[in-house]
Amino acid sequence: MKITFVGAAHEVTGSCTLLELAGENYLIDRGMEQGVDIYENIPLPVAAKDVSAVFLTHAHIDHAGLLPQLYKDGFRGKIYATPATCSLADVMLRDSANIQESEAAWKTRKAERAGEPPVEPLYTVDDAKGAAACFRPCRYGECVTIADGLRVRFSDIGHLLGSACIEFWLREDGTEKKIVFSGDVGNIDQPILNDPLPVAETDYLVVESTYGNRLHDKPKDVRAELTEVLQRAFDRGGSVIIPAFAVGRTQELLYLLREIKQKKLVHGHDGFPVYLDSPLAEEATSVFLQCDTDCFDPETQAVLKSGQNPIWCPGLQFAITAEDSKAINSDPRPKVILSASGMCDAGRIRHHLKHNLWIAENIILIAGYQSKGTLGRALLDGVKEVRLFGEDIAVNAEIAVLHGTSGHADQKGLFNWVEAFAKKPETIFVNHGDTEACEAFQALLQEKGYVAVAPFSGCLLYTSPSPRD
C-alpha cells in the first residue's frame, strides 16, 4: 500500500492524492490549481488510463476541476461521491469546460494574429459530460466495497452540500490499515448545512489546514453584519457587489438575504433588487432544492417544512444570458449583485468589477477565502488599480469582508475535529493549506502529542513494509 501526495501540498488548491493498492491506482480528488496558469497544474505520476477509480470529497473546482482532463486523457473508471456531489459536480464541470473553451478561443484569436499555433482548451464540454457519466453515488454512512481489500464510507463534513470526509479500509497481504481523508472540514453553525461529523478512529489521517494558522473572528451575527453593509452602501447611493462561489456561498448568501428582506432590516430600501448573475449558480441553486432534506441543518429543514423556499427572496432576478448580465449595469438603483467566481479570477464578476470598482459609493464585499495570486486576494491586500479586459481600473470602491461566513473550520475547529477521534491516529498528514498554515497546524498537533507531518508534493507514505525494508 502506497500513498503519494500530488496536489494541495503546502497550497490550498489542486487537491489530489494517489493511493496504490494491490496493483490498482486510486485517486482521492483531482482538483484544479487556482491562481496559476491552468496548464501548470501538477501532472499525475501515473497515466490516466491506469487509474481504476476516483473518490471525490466534494464538488468545488479545486477538488474536482481536472476530472474532465482525466477523462480526456483516457480514464474510464468510476468516480465515487455522494449524490449531491455527483449532481453539483456535473453542473460545475460543464461550466468549467465552457470557460476553458471560451478562454482557448480567445487565446487562439490572439495567437493567430501573432502567427502562432492555436491554443487547445484544457478540456471540452464533451470531456466534462464524459467524466460525469463516470459518477457513482454513495450515500452518507453507507459502507461500500470497491474491490477485494478496499472499502470506503462517506460522512458529512459540513463544508458544502454533499461534502464528505472519506474513510478507507485497506487490506493487502493480510494487513489491514485504515486511512481517513478529511476533505474540507466545515465551519460550525453555518446556514443550510449540518456541522461536521466526527470519526471514531483511524491509523492515518490526512487533514486540511486552510485556516490552520488562524482563528476566525469571534462569532458574529452574520445577518446583522450583512445588513449593516447593505445599509451603508444603499444610504450613499451605492451598490454591493459580492464575488461568491457559485456553489455553496451563493446559496448561503441568498438564505441570509431572504431573512433580511422578510424582516425589512435595511431601512428605507425594502425593495432593493438582488441580481444573481451566474448561470452556474442558478443551476446549482436548483440542485440544492432537489436534494434529500437530510443534507440540510434543522433550521433549513424547518423552513422547507413550512412551505417556503429557503434560498429565494422577493426581488431576486436571475441573469442567464450575456444580455441579462449587461443589463444589470443599466439599473441605477442601489442593488446587490452576486456573481462568480468567488476569487474574481474568472466569470462574470470580472465584468461587474470593471463597471463598479471605480465608483466610491459602492462596496465590494468579500465573502470567502482568497488564494494567493488571485484578483480577490489583491483587492483584500489593498491594491489601488487592477487591469480588467485590457483596461486599468481604479479601485475607489470600499473593499469589505463579511466575517463568519467561512466554509472552512479555523485552527480551533480543525483541532476539535481531530480531538474527537476516540483513538489517536498513528500519524497525521497536514495538507490543503499555504505553507504557513500547514506548518502552524502541524506544530500545534505535535505540541499536543500527535505525530504530524506536512508533506510536500511527491512525498510518499508506505502503509505496509516497502521493498526496501
Region spans (language model):
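Active-site metal-binding loops of divalent metal-dependent hydrolases
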Residues: 8-9, 30-32, 84, 160, ...
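Pre-active-site segment of Zn-dependent metallo-hydrolases
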Residues: 9-12, 21-77, 81-133, 185-195, ...
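Catalytic core of the metallo-beta-lactamase
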Residues: 21, 138-197
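Metallo-beta-lactamase
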Residues: 96-160, 292-332
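Acidic, Ser/Thr-rich peripheral helices and adjacent loops at domain boundaries
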Residues: 101-104, 287-308, 375-395
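Cap/insert and terminal regions of metallo-dependent hydrolase folds
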Residues: 165, 186-277, 363-368, 385-451
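Hard-cation-handling environments
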Residues: 229-240, 244-367
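Conserved small/polar residues in nucleotide/adenosyl-binding loops
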Residues: 462-469
